[in-house]
């Protein structure tokens, strides 16, 4: 046991460093969990913080001990420091400092880096700075390095396959909404089952009672009772408990999700009926989203409103309408249709006949009911004007941007196509949203395949469950990054370096709360990068990313192997983006022309077609929907993580351990 005031300062300093390490871990790694949910608008930032605060602390307290032991005892060889435990404590403190410095720099730049790589690199720097190569368990490092490569590849591949299967079985079906209503409970079960297995079979919680346990292949009766050892000795009963727990969580989750998605669909339908489909999305998506659509789902969203209007307008001899102000009044005097009936084609024909053509503006589609006395019902007038003001501001901004784009095109008209693409990429004017040349801040404008809005709403509700899984999985894995070195210092001070390894629950809880605080204050920077700049994320895509990355992290955590949850999340995003459907040349030209307008107007039958039947997931990869330029920067930061953390830690440790004053003091003891 290392006690006394001389070493107490190391415990206090390590505790402070642990707090800042957990803080930046939450701002970087935990932000990855909610980046896809926030990027797809499935959950607000306030609700995300509430969910993260609770489940991060819960996951860290219940499940964080398994990987924490891997971080602190499977990388550094404690036997080398049996005679000098104070140097072990100093090295762990320096490792926390070195990793924190790099994570703070990366988070400030909005780069999603690996906290696991940071702390392992810092521990390697500490081990190398001691000058004793035996202080590092190199055989364990090999397994960790393999997981660094295997986990991202596995996450990206599984994400691509899962989205392809989901798109084929549900999203592209005409009755996708009816299918997902019947199947969403199964998706919830896929989320809860691995969590239940981890909770029962790999739970580091200790109960102060006597029980039958299995340790080192032998069944013994001992006290205290370790839950994971009890599960190993009673595998059948533990499996039954897992299934029952998963079923219970699925039932509760299904009930909650049913209420949430029905409420969201009702709100969406209400907005659609009042303001039309385009205006219904303005509040949710302030920026314009230019998408090619593979079915008539988005056009059919307003079918009820269109049928209502046509029912009043149709007569036996055709449709006769009288112009009333800026609107169009039908013959039965019960409905007033503001400019822009959903029948875009007939409206364009009328404009051509009158010698006028409207372009570059958004028109409001709204059914206004007329009272029996002929006066207009103005109950929704204020709300309509509010949204029309939003559209007007959008038009003004887009008209200015269109002028700039046109001037840029005129300046580049004498150059060849390749130089045009390069210049456009430099100006951030890539209409196709190509990741090679597109503006990283404008991935919301890429051309991707859209699905039924009501189906997407169900997936946006499911993202709440998948985000919770991601938080629990990352808390189980990432808590170790901050808590592991501090736990080594704390236990060495209290129990000695030869004492039994034990991670107290309050230390894990302290780490979980610190990470939640970091997410609340600085997490928005990484959320923007992963959730909004790499690819365009919709609820169905976000759910797939969160589900796969969470399952991969849980799998490696069950094995007790520390891995990068950041690499899993980003790799899932990239893997899904690479299997986005490709558009043919005609649709690309149509999209380019439509990009000059505020909203793309498409026909139902010609809106989206594939160049051919693509054999997924690896026959043809689509890089136009992935911001490869930003991913290249992120990938380089991954490589730099280990080197930077190791260098900074080695420098701090060398200065602290080998400074003359400290050595002289140690020699006089």
Curated annotation (Swiss-Prot):
Note the InterPro entries from the entry.
Answer: Phos_transporter
State the membrane topology. Answer: Multi-pass membrane protein
Q: Which keywords are on file for this protein? A: Cell membrane, Membrane, Phosphate transport, Symport, Transmembrane, Transmembrane helix, Transport
Q: Where is the composition biased (Polar residues)?
A: 311-335
The catalysed reaction is: 2 Na(+)(out) + phosphate(out) = 2 Na(+)(in) + phosphate(in)
The entry lists its GO molecular-function terms as: phosphate transmembrane transporter activity; symporter activity
What ranges does the record give for the region Disordered, renumbered to this chain?
A: 311-364, 392-444
The UniProt transmembrane annotation reads: 7-27, 48-68, 87-107, 109-129, 144-164, 187-207, 240-260, 503-523, 543-563, 633-653
The residue spans the entry assigns to the Extracellular side of the membrane are as follows 1-6, 69-86, 130-143, 208-239, 524-542, 654-669
Instruction: Give the source's domain of life in one word.
Output: Eukaryota
Q: What does this protein do?
A: Sodium-phosphate symporter which preferentially transports the monovalent form of phosphate with a stoichiometry of two sodium ions per phosphate ion.
Protein's UniProt name: Sodium-dependent phosphate transporter
Q: Which organism is it from?
A: Plasmodium falciparum
């Amino acid at each position: 046991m290392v006690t006394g005031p001389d070493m107490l300062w190391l415990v206090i300093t390590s505790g402070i460093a642990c707090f800042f390490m957990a803080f930046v871990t939450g701002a970087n790694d935990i932000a990855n969990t909610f980046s896809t949910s926030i990027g797809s608008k499935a959950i607000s930032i306030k609700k995300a913080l509430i969910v993260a605060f609770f489940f991060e602390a819960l996951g860290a307290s219940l499940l964080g001990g398994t990987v924490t032991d891997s971080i602190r005892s499977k990388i550094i060889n404690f036997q080398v420091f049996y005679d000098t435990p104070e140097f072990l404590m100093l090295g762990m403190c320096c490792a926390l400092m070195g990793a924190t410095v790099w994570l703070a720099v990366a988070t400030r730049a909005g780069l999603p880096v690996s906290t696991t790589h940071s702390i392992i690199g810092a521990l390697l720097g500490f081990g190398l700075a001691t000058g004793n190569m035996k202080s590092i368990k190199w055989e364990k490092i090999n397994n960790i390095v393999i997981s660094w490569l295997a986990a991202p590849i596995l996450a990206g591949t599984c994400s691509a396959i899962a989205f392809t299967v989901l798109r084929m079985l549900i999203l592209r079906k005409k009755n996708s909404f009816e299918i997902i209503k019947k199947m969403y409970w199964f998706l919830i079960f896929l989320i809860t089952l691995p969590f239940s297995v981890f909770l029962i079979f790999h739970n580091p919680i200790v109960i102060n009672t006597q029980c039958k346990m299995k340790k080192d292949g032998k069944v013994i009766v001992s006290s205290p009772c370790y839950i994971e050892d009890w599960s190993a000795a009673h595998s059948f009963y533990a499996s039954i408990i897992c299934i029952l727990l998963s079923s219970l969580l699925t039932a509760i989750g299904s009930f909650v999700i049913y209420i949430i998605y029905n409420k969201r669909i009702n709100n969406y339908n209400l907005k659609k009926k009042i303001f039309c489909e385009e205006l219904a999305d303005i509040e949710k998506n302030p920026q314009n989203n230019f998408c090619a659509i593979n079915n008539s789902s988005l056009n059919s969203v307003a079918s009820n409103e269109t049928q209502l209007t046509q029912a009043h307008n149709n007569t036996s001899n055709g449709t006769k309408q009288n112009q009333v102000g800026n609107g169009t009044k039908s013959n039965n005097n019960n409905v007033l249709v503001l400019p822009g009936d959903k029948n875009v084609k007939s409206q364009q024909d009328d404009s051509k006949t009158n010698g006028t053509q409207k372009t570059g503006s958004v028109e409001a589609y709204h059914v206004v009911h007329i009272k029996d006395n002929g006066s207009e019902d103005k109950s929704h007038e204020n709300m309509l004007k509010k949204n029309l003001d939003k559209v007007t501001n959008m038009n003004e901004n887009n008209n200015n941007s269109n002028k700039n784009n046109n001037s840029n095109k005129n300046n580049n008209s004498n150059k060849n196509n390749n130089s045009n693409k390069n210049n456009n990429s430099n100006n951030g004017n890539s209409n196709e949203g190509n990741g090679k040349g597109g503006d990283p801040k404008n991935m919301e404008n890429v051309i991707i395949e859209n699905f039924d809005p009501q189906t997407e709403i169900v997936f946006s509700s499911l993202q709440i469950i998948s985000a919770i899984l991601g938080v629990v999985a990352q808390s189980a894995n990432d808590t170790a990054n901050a808590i592991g070195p501090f736990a080594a210092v704390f236990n060495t001070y209290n129990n000695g370096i030869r004492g039994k390894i034990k991670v107290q629950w309050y230390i894990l809880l302290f780490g979980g709360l610190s990470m939640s605080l970091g997410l609340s204050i600085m997490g928005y920077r990484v959320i923007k990068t992963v959730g909004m700049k790499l690819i365009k994320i919709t609820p169905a895509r976000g759910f797939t990313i969160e589900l796969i990355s969470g399952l991969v992290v849980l799998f490696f955590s069950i094995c007790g192997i520390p891995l990068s949850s950041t690499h899993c999340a980003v790799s899932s995003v990239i893997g899904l983006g690479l299997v986005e459907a490709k558009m043919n040349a005609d649709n690309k030209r149509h999209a380019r022309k439509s990009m000059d307008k505020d909203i793309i107007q498409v026909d139902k039958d010609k809106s989206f077609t594939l160049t051919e039947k693509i054999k997924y997931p690896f026959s043809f990869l689509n890089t136009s929907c992935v911001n490869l330029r930003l991913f290249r920067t992120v990938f380089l930061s991954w490589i730099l993580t280990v080197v930077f953390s190791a260098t900074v830690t080695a420098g701090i440790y060398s200065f602290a351990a080998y400074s003359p004053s400290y050595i002289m003091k140690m020699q006089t003891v």
